[in-house]
From Swiss-Prot:
SUPFAM superfamilies: HLH, helix-loop-helix DNA-binding domain. CDD domains: bHLH_AtMYC1_like. The gene is BHLH91. InterPro entries: bHLH91-like, bHLH_dom, HLH_DNA-bd_sf, MYC1-like_bHLH. This is Transcription factor bHLH91. Flowers. The lineage of its organism: Eukaryota, Viridiplantae, Streptophyta, Embryophyta, Tracheophyta. GO terms for biological process: anther wall tapetum development; callose deposition in cell wall; pollen development; regulation of DNA-templated transcription. Residues 278-320 are annotated as: Disordered. One of its GO terms (cellular component) is nucleus. It comes from Arabidopsis thaliana. Residues 297-307 have a biased composition (Acidic residues).
Length: 428
């Protein structure tokens, strides 16, 4: 059954203690290795005459036993010891432990002698045969060849909780129970017991509070929105001067100030009208009372009535003078060819008109002032470059209700209309 070689002794000795047979450990080479005479070219294996792996096996395939009963008994004992050592180890049986195990558990078992030539190749002196399928199933995942490198633990290849236990050699029932107990618990230390961090969807991110989603706008959208605002402001201004943003803002500020002055002016006119009506009613009452007193012909009574009637009249006059503040307003309006400046101080109105010198607006403005019930007191004019400049000093008639915006709008309307009418004649 075995191939005989010059270094193998077929007469094996049987050990009565362990039941194994072992060859002699000391040997001498009987003769040198020489190639056969009949062949001139031999293979590398024939020249070296390497023994097969069966010659180095320590199991019964290369050991001759006296009988079959002792052979079966020794095999069962060896399997029992191998299973016990594998279960006690944490990360598998290393090569040194296996050699120690073979030397201690079977002291009488020795390997077959190896020639001196083969010792130079550093071949293994003994090879442990593969154990049963149960041992392989238990040790395939317990032995880690990278354990001595002290590498950090790696997450499982399959992130699912159902298969993580299968890949790590852990029962899936215990894994799912642990995951169920850790759902919603962010500070639970049980996730790090095995040295592997398990990432799952149930682990919620820590936050400092609810954050409201702010609308994100691009720079282009912001510019479009700002342009729309400027266009809306431009539509609110009655007579915008230019279309640029700075001019629109200035025109808007001027228009707001004009509205404020108009409000204050209207309040003054209303208060003045109330005081004027009260004063007229008091004068009528005074005349009627004086007539009645003359009919009675009682001088003493007349003196008393006059003293009584003077008090209400003086009270009304003082009330009107105290309630009426000094009226003051100022307004500027511009068009393509005309610029009007109106200033009102109490009942005096000063109007300044500047226009191009193609037309003469002096007569037109004078007619407009008469229509607005303004008493013209003084007019001054002159030429400044290509423009005419006129200054009108007027006074508001008593009982008239007029304000600066109405004067400016009317003057600009008339002057611009006359200027547009005179353009075709000047072209010819």
């Amino acid at each position: 059954m075995y191939e005989e070689s010059s270094c193998f002794d077929p007469n094996s000795m049987v050990d009565n203690n362990g039941g194994f047979c072992a060859a002699e450990t000391t040997f001498t080479v009987s003769h040198q290795f020489q190639p056969p005479l009949g062949s001139t070219t031999n293979s590398f294996d024939d020249d070296l005459k390497l023994p097969t792996m069966d010659e180095f096996s320590v199991f019964p395939s290369v050991i001759s036993l006296p009988n079959s009963e002792t052979q079966n008994q020794n095999i069962s004992n060896n399997n029992h010891l191998i299973n016990q050592m594998i279960q006690e180890s944490n990360w598998g049986v290393s090569e040194d432990n296996s050699n120690f195990f073979m030397n201690t558990s079977h002291p009488n078992t020795t390997t077959t002698p190896i020639p001196d030539l083969l010792s130079l190749l550093h071949l293994p002196r003994c090879s442990m045969s593969l154990p049963s399928s149960d041992i392989m199933a238990g040790s395939c995942f317990t032995y880690d060849p990278l354990f001595h490198l002290n590498l950090p633990p790696q997450p499982p290849l399959i992130p699912s909780n159902d298969y993580s236990g299968y890949l790590l050699g852990i029962d899936t029932n215990t894994t799912t129970q642990r995951d169920e107990s850790n759902v919603g618990d962010e500070n639970n230390n049980a996730q790090f017991d095995s040295g592997i961090i398990e990432f799952s969807k149930e682990i919620r991110r820590k936050g400092r509070g609810k954050r409201k989603n702010k609308p994100f706008t691009t720079e282009r959208e912001r510019r479009c929105h700002l342009n729309e605002r400027y266009e809306a402001l431009k539509l609110l201004i009655p007579s915008p001067s230019k279309g640029d943003r700075a001019s629109i803002l200035q025109d808007g500020i001027d228009y707001i100030n004009e509205l404020r002055r108009r409000v204050s002016e209207l309040k003054y006119l209303v208060e003045r009208k109330r005081c004027g009506g009260r004063h007229k009613n008091n004068e009528v009452d005074d005349n009627n009372n004086n007539k009645n007193l003359d009919d009675h012909g009682n001088e003493d009574d007349d003196d008393d009535d006059e003293n009584m009637e003077k008090k209400p009249e003086s009270d009304v006059i003082d009330q009107c003078s105290s309630n009426n503040s000094l009226r003051c307003s100022w307004l500027q309006r511009k068009s393509k060819v005309t610029e009007v400046d109106v200033r009102i101080v109490d009942d005096e109105v000063t109007i300044k008109v500047v226009q191009k010198k193609k037309i003469n607006c002096l007569l037109l403005v004078s007619k407009v002032l008469d229509q607005l019930q303004l008493d013209l007191h003084h007019v001054a004019g002159g030429q400044i470059g290509e423009h005419y400049s006129f200054l009108f000093n007027t006074k508001i008639y008593e009982g008239s209700t007029i304000y600066a915006s109405a004067i400016a709008n009317r003057v600009i309307e008339v002057v611009d209309k006359h200027y547009m009418a005179s353009l075709p004649n000047s072209n010819y």
